[in-house]
Amino acid sequence: MNKPSPPLKKRGLGRGLEALLGSKGGSSVPPTVAEGQLPGEVLRTLQITQLQPSKYQPRREMSEPKLAELADSIKAQGVIQPIIVRELDVDMFEIVAGERRWRASQLAGLTEVPVLVRELDDRTVVAMALIENIQREDLNPLEEAQALQRLIDEFSLTHAEAAEAVGRSRAAVSNLLRLLELPLGIRTLLQSRRLEMGHARALLTLAPELADKLAKEAADQGWSVREVEHRAQQFAAGKVPDIRDKKSKSPASAPAQPDIASLETELSEHLGTKVAINHGRAGKGKLVIHYTDLDVLDGVLERLRARVAD
């Protein structure tokens, strides 16, 4: 028997859809669902087997550990936020937003979940799927850039319009999109989180072959963003630093305790930038959050505020 769920937290996708669809002549979407039920919207409980993923889902991979964490939360508290769906056929529904909740609910052993059934056209479904994914906290920079580019392509948006739709600055959106210009090898390192956005941006000024070589060394040797910036500047100035199997001499490259290193990685993934933990004696230490420019700092603050709000 399923555990009774607490009162549902009905939350929309913010002003993103309003900015995107309202300005393009589509139906305007209120800032939050809680302010009033949308026309044609029905709150229901459906069997998990009645739902299927959307063909417009831009996210290709979902972290198994993160799904397991969400499943544990659902076991304890139930599904707080309903899954948004649209009807496909008799007794079958397509997930518009909330596929992670659906998958985690299956892991948690639930047989039914709360849903909001909406009457939505393909255009709106695409917009909701893209915006939900872009606003997620655990996307790597390349996934964000790819989702933003698809949003721009689907709706013929300028960078400024895309920024308004997802609640980012225009500069932050433009910087993310530049990552798509990088060679495949560097994009792969970004995808696997072996490089950060700051590393990749420093490499944009170099020729593709040289950028690829420097990126591989940076990932293998664990260079900091500052180290990569310094070496890229040397190449741009006509100097050729030796990058053959030399580890950075920066104190930050000293080996960390396994548990500290694991914590640093987890925090870095959550905040989207490098995080260093300097753990001293008697349990004292420092937590250092690195940022290469104000856009990166902006992103860190957004993620921290989102955590506090939740």
Swiss-Prot record:
Any one GO cellular component localisation term in the record: chromosome
Record InterPro entries: Chromosome_partition/occlusion, HTH_ParB/Spo0J, ParB/RepB/Spo0J, ParB/Sulfiredoxin_dom, ParB/Sulfiredoxin_sf, ParB_dimer_C
Keywords for the protein's UniProt record, in alphabetical order: Chromosome partition, DNA-binding
CDD domains: SPO0J_N (cd16393)
A single MF term (Gene Ontology): DNA binding
Ranges for region Disordered: 1-35, 239-259
Biological process, per Gene Ontology: chromosome segregation; positive regulation of sporulation resulting in formation of a cellular spore
Lineage: superkingdom: Bacteria
Pfam families: HTH_ParB, ParB_dimer, ParBc
Family as reported in the entry's similarity comment: Belongs to the ParB family.
Known function: Involved in chromosome partition. Localize to both poles of the predivisional cell following completion of DNA replication. Binds to the DNA origin of replication.
Identification of the protein by name: Probable chromosome-partitioning protein ParB
Provenance organism: Xylella fastidiosa (strain 9a5c)
Encoding gene, per UniProt annotation: parB
